[in-house]
């Protein structure tokens, strides 16, 4: 299942997409500040969403002030 990830700072979206790719995610930009993400290492959509939320929050800790919204 693909999830949509919207970032408040479009200049950092490429960096986040690269970080996601290093973790085995497939991500493609669908708007200047939005990407579609698939995490194939999970069994369910709920598991994928939880894993991605955890990863994005950890990434945000190194990027104060950047907001990220994950949705289906």
Regions found by a protein language model. Name each.
Residues 39-72:
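C-terminal basic regulatory modules in eukaryotic proteins
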């Amino acid at each position: 299942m693909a999830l949509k990830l919207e970032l408040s700072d479009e200049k950092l979206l490429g960096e986040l997409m690269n970080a996601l790719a290093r973790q085995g995610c497939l991500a493609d930009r669908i708007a200047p500040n939005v990407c579609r993400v698939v995490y194939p290492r999970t069994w369910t959509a709920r598991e994928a969403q939880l894993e991605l939320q955890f990863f994005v929050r950890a990434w945000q800790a190194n990027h104060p002030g950047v907001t990220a919204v994950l949705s289906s």
